[in-house]
């Protein structure tokens, strides 16, 4: 339907949608001009002008179309019957953003209208080519000059040509666009046909219905403040939304009615929600209801999601801001309620703080420590418990209160014999370390024998001499007594030799508490000295934590794996931090970064353990008394297994001592063929496996009576278990432990063929690095070549140099040895069997030299001979280490004729004096050599004339 209506250009970013009421501001001149358009002529004889007649005709047609009723007979002055066209404007900013005036349906130069209420000479503003047919509900006087009109949207319109643009209120031709389905005043027959729903339209309708329903639900919630305010400000529109939403269901009936309802719902929701101007323009431009539903459902869903997120963020921020205040108020209310009910907690915050204060005041602290504690107590009393610093300060004070400032363990000073008995019961051998510990215990006992009166007199005299001018003790002037300082021992040895258990035995012998601190993998200096309290999660260092856990200030502290402590890095140097702890002249005033005042560590007995000394810094090593613990020999392992391991594993596996019998030869076979280690850990595992196997055999031999297992005591009384043999034999080990892990073919050959000899084959002696020794065979051969020496068997640099020295000595003494070989025409190959095992060291020099001499002279070497020693280019035999292990290894291999350097005779004498060899050395024929010529004489009973060294 076409009509002519007054044209009202809306303010910027303003859109009037059908079915929605809105206030629009007008100037006084514009309001008067609009009313004059519908004013009756004063003279009854004067007819309406042509423009007025067209305007009145259009208004009458629209009134009939929209079924508007007059409320009085006051002619066209009744404001409720005045109908106008409201068109949104395109601002200059929007024109610049789009880059062209015709963007978004803007008119050409003919459709540009002036801003209402201004002179026509001012800058024009473009308007959209579509708008809304509105009726003026009422006029309102907003001030002395301006007016406001309340307009109600009736339908969409399409803007045509301007009819009159001379006045303040222009008129224009419009086309009313109710919908695209033909429901207008001029609808044809096709409008009677019922439209159908497509799948896409149904899906969009469901989204629209769900979004609208969720908006209403959110508005009903108490915490949805944003939606509540919107709904409250648009009460009329909100009521219309509820009415249309009730009509609109998930299963629509009449498609025509449902479309009308959905179209009206989109317009109403776009008016309620704070949507953008562009979104409202897009909905207003959608003349087709399906198109309007599609755009509206998309816009509403997006805006609804954004508003839900905004509501959630606002709620979260508000809750976090008020959390502390709410907690404080709740605590106060809870305390008041408990007081009224008489249910107050006797152990409240104040009571705990009072108890902590009393505990701190009762400690015997130094003046510096007492000053720090007093200051922190004053601080914490002024803080509210909700303050973050409160818990930090309280943790610090609790840490100080839990430290053993004046708590110590009274040493159970036993006699030297009693202490030795305790150490011997826990460990076999280790006589040198036991000797050092007994020395300390003896000194401690002698000091304790002084009378209490003498000690009191000395303390009184020392206190009087160190008093300051005010009669108070001056700690800075008090001399430090180092006479009673405990030793700082470093036990160095391979794994499993009993370093950790030895420290426990020392604590048991003294009656002191034991504390173990693992230093392996410590890479941060703060783990030793502690963190400063300014850091989040700060805590004391390992030593302060250890004292806190053990509860006394004089424990035996084991510094385990001190050789594996980290070196200098960007976290500091932990090894350097240990210098103060392990210095007897400094650890009395050890300052932890967390405590931040001196703590006395001088009363602790520090025992450190390490596997080697190479990784320990020299300054740190200098502060400790090093005691070497060598690996156990096979004979020592035999005694340890008999005395400690077998009874322990027998009991652990539910057997009695007499129910498992492992002879010495079986234990020795386990040590040599199944375990080769410095300690006894793996040996204990193998013995445990043997005991478990015997436990299975013993359980099988038990008789069953009526399905119940007969007890061992009952069976013993009956004389049962005749089929059970408690004795373990070597033949049983294969079934229990499997095949032998280590085989000594060379030793077996020496035992089975004692008279067989081979040219160029010699038995050396090697220390295996696990506390054990054994044979190290060398094989030499020659072939035509160019005088090259080839070495195989995974030999290290040192042993390769020893081989070169040996060959050079043979070449230089070839004439004296009666060797006529042309060394430039032969290649020499020296091989050490067991090529997968690395071999290194200078102690095989004598053996390799003898192999070369045997090769070139063609003389075989008896397999019953073994030797060790380093050799120089002049043929001098130098001393080597590991003599005890090498001799015992040779004995187990069946070799009893040994050649040692003369300088190692003292080592053999010392072992015989200590008796740690179990009488093995007395059964061996040991020869001592000083030069290589002595070796040749002992092997082949030949005398050689060495070369005369020229002195010219």
Curated annotation (Swiss-Prot):
Q: What does the record list as GO biological process?
A: protein import into peroxisome matrix; protein processing; protein quality control for misfolded or incompletely synthesized proteins; protein targeting to peroxisome
Q: Which Pfam families match?
A: AAA, Lon_C, Lon_lid, LON_substr_bdg
Identify the InterPro entries for this entry. Answer: AAA+_ATPase, ATPase_AAA_core, Lon_bac/euk-typ, Lon_lid, Lon_proteolytic, Lon_Prtase, Lon_prtase_N, Lon_prtase_N_sf
Domain Lon N-terminal: residue ranges: 5-304
The organism's superkingdom is given as Eukaryota
Where along the sequence do coiled-coil regions lie? none
Q: What is this protein called?
A: Lon protease homolog 2, peroxisomal
Q: Which organism is it from?
A: Yarrowia lipolytica (strain CLIB 122 / E 150)
